[in-house]
A protein has these predicted regions:
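Extracytosolic ligand-binding ectodomains
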Residues: 1-318
Length: 318
């Protein structure tokens, strides 16, 4: 085996998303990389996904809130469907609720990923009366109260909102039969809900419970502490560490067979047996499966204050 020194290139994309694919092609021509590892994409990864599929470049476990891929794709793999998985979890709960809910009202801010999640929930709930209410992109969080005034006991409320908007909810919760919030958008167990809302709300939670993932995540945090790397976005950093570790281990196993398709196949084979899976209880990939974590919980706050959670039922694989 020939010893090789791997070099990391950082590609930064600028300007509007419709120009990203051309920038990526220019980067690839100048630096013909073997794979794209992790990455930070926020709410729009579609141009990067298209590029990786078109150029046959493995695109491995990016940090994105709305994955662009489909299970039928090959070169792009993700840890989770993100808020789209949360929409499926809530749809599962709505199905269990039967006819007791007359109307589902979804609230999201224009231009944010909650819009995609709201579309996914509507698509997963055929026959339901679903009404979307939209906060203006740069509007005041105080406008939330007006959007919730007419809700009643036969309604359910879904909040696809960031922490800043959750903080601005009125002190008394809406008089609905059910309230769900997005865990990924709201901050998971640190979602800053007003006290009365904490009692009423259920959280779509697309990762393992804090007490069950603590050992796996602490292993990663210890690695950061030893190297004096500040932790400023714990899940993003843990997922990035996991992605880099998976790729490093896989490269050791493929010896000199540096073929991009083979890298994907080896990751599929190795992932199912991995013990340290970070935020996720179990990860698995296979042909026709491009999202490694396939389920989540519905949880509620256990106390009037603090971050302790109680699951409302078992792990759900929608």
């Amino acid at each position: 085996m020939v010893n090789r020194r791997w070099q990391l290139h950082v590609w930064e994309l600028t300007g509007p998303p419709d120009g990203w694919e051309q920038q990526l092609k220019q980067h690839l021509a100048a630096e013909p990389v073997f794979a794209v590892i992790s990455g930070l994409g926020g709410n729009n990864w579609e141009p990067v996904h298209r590029f990786c599929e078109a150029e046959s470049v493995p695109c491995l476990f990016p940090n994105v809130e709305v994955p662009a891929g489909r299970d039928e794709d090959f070169y792009s793999v993700y840890f989770s469907r993100g808020v789209l998985l949360e929409a499926q979890l809530i749809a599962h709960q709505l199905q269990d609720a039967g006819e007791g809910i007359r109307r589902v009202v979804q609230v999201y801010r224009a231009g944010d990923v909650g819009e995609h999640a709201a579309e996914a929930l509507k698509a997963a709930s055929p026959g339901r009366q679903i009404e979307n209410r939209v906060l203006k992109l740069h509007g005041s969080s105080k406008d939330l109260s007006a959007l919730l005034q007419d809700l009643g006991a036969a309604d359910a409320l879904v909040l696809w909102l960031r922490p800043e908007d959750l903080k601005a909810l009125p002190s008394e919760p809406a008089r609905t039969s059910q309230v769900w919030i997005s865990g990924e958008m709201g901050g998971l167990e640190f979602a800053p809900l007003p006290a009365a809302w904490r009692v009423a709300a259920r959280i779509a939670y697309p990762v393992d419970l804090p007490g069950q993932r603590v050992v796996r995540v602490d292993y990663t945090l210890s690695w950061f502490r030893i190297r004096h790397i500040p932790v400023v976005a714990q899940q993003v950093q843990a997922d990035t560490y996991l992605a880099c570790g998976l790729v490093a281990e896989t490269l050791n196993h493929i010896v000199d067979a540096f073929v991009r398709d083979y890298l994907i196949e080896r990751i599929e084979m190795a992932l199912d047996h991995r013990v340290l899976t970070g935020y996720y209880p179990h990860l698995t990939l296979a042909p026709g499966q491009r999202f490694a974590s396939k389920g989540g919980y519905i949880v509620r706050f256990a106390d009037p204050a603090g971050a302790r959670l109680t699951p409302v039922g078992e792990w759900i694989t929608p």
